[in-house]
Each structure stands twice: as structure tokens, then as C-alpha cells.
Amino acid sequence: MQEFMNFEECSKQNTNNCKQHEKNIDENNCSCKEKKVQSKKVSSDHSSSEDNASSDINSNKAETLTLNCGDQSDNKNSISDIESNKFIPNENDFQMLKKQLNDLKAENVNLKRDLQEAHQQRTNDNLKYLADFDNFKKRITVQTNREIKYALTDFIKNILIPLEQFEKVLEMPKVDDSVKSFLLGFKMIHKQVKDILQKEGVEEIKALGVKFDPNFHYALEKISDLKQPNGINVLVLQKGFLYKDLVIKPAMVKVNEWSDKNND
């Protein structure tokens, strides 16, 4: 298209040049005629010279017209070549472009689906990690609270051993009055220690005369007394203790069990 416009401009310019050149030739011819009228007495040689000049001018005009026509012919040939090489799509080209477009659309759909799946997977992973972390915090909290709650467990277990021995000494028969006065002081100390342990959450497990419970009692001996209820602790061999809600030492008991004989 640009070359076609250039061709039109070139044609217009050549036409203008031709008109201007013809005008110049006409002016020269008029000038020559005036000179011939005014100088009729000029010699034949001078007249011959003017004729030669006029011939040269006509010859130049013919050459200029020939060149301009040649340029116009070349421009027309160039436009024809451009039009002959112009791309004209056919049905196969349209089908190929349509197939490429459909392929791109399908690829776009697949990419969107993959992106959504990746986003959903990442969301699920984040939720799983958050849930795991929340459970971990809960376990740590429970464990920490338990450790704080039962921080004195080992200490209480250790102090109960000499305390039981201390009680056995206090239960011995009193023979001498001087010993009785010492025992009275020991009883006061024993009571103070028990009060301190009780404030810390230590209490004695009830065992005598109650039904045997494997969670709190440990049977060292068994008897079969039909006069007493079945499954009852008839004797406490060693005291048991609770620290808050934790059994730090089960009660050692003798259990009355006669159900087997009774069934016989």
C-alpha cells in the first residue's frame, strides 16, 4: 500500500514536471519568435543557430517524456509484483489456526485445573500442619500441667517410707514413763508432718472394711470367712496413699473371698 502511494506521488510529480517543462518550452518559443520579428536583419548564421537551439529543446522534451513514462512503467510493475506476492489464506490455514486456538484453550483449562488442585492441596496441607501443631501444643500443655501438678511425687514417696517406720515406733507398748514423754513429743512431730502432707494433697487410702478395688488395693493375703461379706478387706497390712488423684502407693490388704466355696 505504501509503495502504491509512492507511485501515485511519483506520477503526479512527473506530470507536473512535464507541464512545467512544456511551459518553459512555449515561453522559449515565444521569445524566439519575438527575437525573429525584432531582428529580421540578423545574418543567416545567427538564424541557423536559433534553429539548432530549438531542435535541442525539442529533443530534451522528448527525452524527458520518455524517462517519465519509463518510471511510471517501472512503478506499475513494482505494484503488480507486490499484489502477486500478497498472502491469501486458504481453508487449510483457517483450520490450522482454529486447531491451534482450541489446543491453547484446552491447555489453559488444564493449567487452571492444575493450579486449583495445587492451591487446594496446599490449603489442606496447611490445615493439617495447623491441626498437628495445635495437638502438639495441647499435649505439651497437658504434660506440663501434669508435671507441675505432680511435681512432689518422688519426694512424697521417699518421705512416706520413714514416716511409716515412725508410726510403728509410736505404736510400740509404753513401758517406762521417761520413754512415754519422748513418745509424746514424737507424736506431735508425726502429726505436724501428716498435716503438711495433707495440705499438699496427700491422703490415706481407705481400705479396712471396704470392698476390694484393684485400683487402690493390693491383695497380699486371702481368707474365706463366711461370717463376713465376700470381697471385703478384713485387714490392712500396709497403708496406701493418694497424692491428689494419683495413687502413689496402693494399700496392702487381706481380702475375704469365699464365693468359690459358697458355690460348691
Swiss-Prot record:
<dbReference type="GO" id="GO:0042803">
    <property type="term" value="F:protein homodimerization activity"/>
</dbReference>
<dbReference type="Pfam" id="PF01025">
    <property type="entry name" value="GrpE"/>
</dbReference>
<comment type="similarity">
    <text>Belongs to the GrpE family.</text>
</comment>
<dbReference type="GO" id="GO:0005737">
    <property type="term" value="C:cytoplasm"/>
</dbReference>
<comment type="function">
    <text>Participates actively in the response to hyperosmotic and heat shock by preventing the aggregation of stress-denatured proteins, in association with DnaK and GrpE. It is the nucleotide exchange factor for DnaK and may function as a thermosensor. Unfolded proteins bind initially to DnaJ; upon interaction with the DnaJ-bound protein, DnaK hydrolyzes its bound ATP, resulting in the formation of a stable complex. GrpE releases ADP from DnaK; ATP binding to DnaK triggers the release of the substrate protein, thus completing the reaction cycle.</text>
</comment>
<comment type="subunit">
    <text>Homodimer.</text>
</comment>
<protein>
    <recommendedName>
        <fullName>Protein GrpE</fullName>
    </recommendedName>
</protein>
<dbReference type="GO" id="GO:0051082">
    <property type="term" value="F:unfolded protein binding"/>
</dbReference>
<dbReference type="GO" id="GO:0051087">
    <property type="term" value="F:protein-folding chaperone binding"/>
</dbReference>
<dbReference type="GO" id="GO:0000774">
    <property type="term" value="F:adenyl-nucleotide exchange factor activity"/>
</dbReference>
<dbReference type="GO" id="GO:0006457">
    <property type="term" value="P:protein folding"/>
</dbReference>
<feature type="region of interest" description="Disordered">
    <location>
        <begin position="36"/>
        <end position="59"/>
    </location>
</feature>
<dbReference type="InterPro" id="IPR009012">
    <property type="entry name" value="GrpE_head"/>
</dbReference>
<feature type="compositionally biased region" description="Low complexity">
    <location>
        <begin position="50"/>
        <end position="59"/>
    </location>
</feature>
<dbReference type="InterPro" id="IPR000740">
    <property type="entry name" value="GrpE"/>
</dbReference>
<dbReference type="InterPro" id="IPR013805">
    <property type="entry name" value="GrpE_coiled_coil"/>
</dbReference>
<keyword id="KW-0143">Chaperone</keyword>
<feature type="compositionally biased region" description="Basic and acidic residues">
    <location>
        <begin position="36"/>
        <end position="49"/>
    </location>
</feature>
<keyword id="KW-0963">Cytoplasm</keyword>
<keyword id="KW-0346">Stress response</keyword>
